[in-house]
């Protein structure tokens, strides 16, 4: 997390992207529907891997692995066949809506799945250049086509990026 702390300090990060403080101390969030007051139980959106990881540590939790996330998604999808069609604004009390309204960071580094082989050699170079210094995000977002969302669908970004509807899901080890 030392790189994260350096990033926070050098970029003067004090809150998630698109949050705005007014002179009365009120926090508003710029959303797809304009500027709104924060919704207390809504998931935090537009955070970096560094912010997600630091919050998880503060909450005595951790970020899930990609594998744990896929198991979670498989379980949720088996219970709700219409999960992929959910595109409303997120609300924390409805797990089905919170699954694919935000990508969530995992602690897994982006690499190819075991046994993956590209269709063409030209694509191999394209794939490999993205597999350095990036982390996997799972779920999907309000901007993800519903046809793309599945248990194994993944996204990947560098740890400082936070523009892409990124959020957090916490995990804890079973004692």
Indicate where each model-derived feature is located.
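Short proline/glycine-enriched turn/loop segments at secondary-structure junctions
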Residues: 125-129, 155-162
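Functional-site microenvironments in short loops/helix caps that host divalent-cation chemistry
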Residues: 1-151
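Sequence-pattern detector for short linear motifs
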Residues: 153, 157, 172-175
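Short, structured beta-strand segments at or near domain termini in extracellular proteins/domains
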Residues: 162-175
């Amino acid at each position: 997390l030392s790189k994260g702390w350096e990033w926070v300090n050098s970029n003067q990060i004090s809150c998630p992207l698109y949050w705005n403080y007014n002179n009365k101390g009120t926090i508003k969030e710029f959303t797809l529907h304009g500027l709104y007051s924060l919704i207390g139980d809504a998931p935090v959106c537009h955070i970096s891997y560094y912010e997600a990881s630091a919050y998880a540590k503060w909450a005595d939790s951790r970020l899930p692995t990609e594998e744990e996330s896929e198991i979670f998604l498989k379980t949720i999808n088996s219970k709700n066949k219409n999960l992929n069609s959910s595109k409303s604004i997120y609300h924390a009390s409805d797990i089905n809506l919170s699954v694919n309204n935000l990508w969530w960071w995992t602690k897994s580094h982006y690499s190819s799945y075991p046994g993956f082989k590209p269709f063409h050699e030209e694509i191999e170079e394209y794939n490999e250049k993205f597999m350095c210094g990036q982390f996997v995000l799972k779920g999907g977002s309000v901007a993800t086509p519903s046809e793309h969302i599945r248990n194994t669908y993944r996204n990947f970004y560098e740890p400082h990026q936070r523009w892409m509807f990124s959020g957090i899901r916490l995990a804890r080890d079973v004692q």
